Design a protein with these regions (language model features):
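Conserved C-terminal region and hinge/linker of Rieske [2Fe-2S] proteins, especially
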Residues: 1-199
Length: 199
């Protein structure tokens, strides 16, 4: 084991300890003297921080997926995540699938690969998209028919990621539906697209 690994582990541990300490400090604050407008501004800040957490989880989940076999984990990755974090298996599976899409990936020869929905991943890292908004964009991307070219896919995903910073999830879902109708005017899917189109 190299000393670099120990230093990295120490830095990671210290960063998480600092995050814990910062949250403890904020949780101990009193907010009684604030105006409603100030409280809403702080709630907006809380939401942005909450939205950034998955960007920390994605590389951890993807690393476990690469490094540990189901035998080592005692089952599926989603089950191991559920047991470790005490969340439901359904939520763990959602996080594993989202991490596979939005987290950093590694190619066969070890080279880093950017997330497929790059704009969505970047907006999530900045705390600009909620998990619900991310789910809308991921669903849209997965349901696009195979005949739509990559440049159009990327442009559509970028547009939805940008609009997701301005609209609530249900509004974004309506926009995604309209965009899907524009891209697939006839609603035609090839045979291989049918499972994706069905959801």
């Amino acid at each position: 084991m190299s000393s670099g690994s120990i230093i990295d582990r120490d830095a990671i541990s210290a960063a998480f300890d600092a995050l814990d300490a910062a949250l403890d400090g904020v949780a101990a604050l009193g907010f009684d003297g604030l105006t409603p407008r100030e409280c809403l501004a702080l709630l907006t800040h809380c939401e942005r921080l909450r939205r950034r957490l998955p960007a920390i989880e994605h590389p951890l989940i993807n690393h476990v997926a690469r490094q540990a076999s189901p035998a080592e984990l005692g089952g599926r990755l989603s089950h191991a995540v559920a047991e470790a974090t005490l969340i439901s298996r359904a939520e763990a599976a959602r996080r594993v699938h989202t991490a596979a899409d939005l987290g950093p990936r590694v190619g066969l020869t070890g080279e880093p690969i950017a997330p497929a929905p790059a704009a969505t991943a970047a907006a999530q890292r900045e705390g600009l998209l909620s998990p619900e908004q991310v789910a809308v964009i991921r669903k849209f991307c997965h349901q696009l028919p195979g005949w739509i070219d990559q440049a159009t896919r990327e442009r559509a995903e970028t547009d939805l990621a940008r609009e997701g910073t301005r609209y609530r999830p249900e509004q974004l879902a309506a926009l995604a539906g309209t965009l899907d109708d524009c891209l697939n005017l006839d609603g035609l899917y090839r045979d291989e697209d049918q499972p994706a189109a069905a959801g």
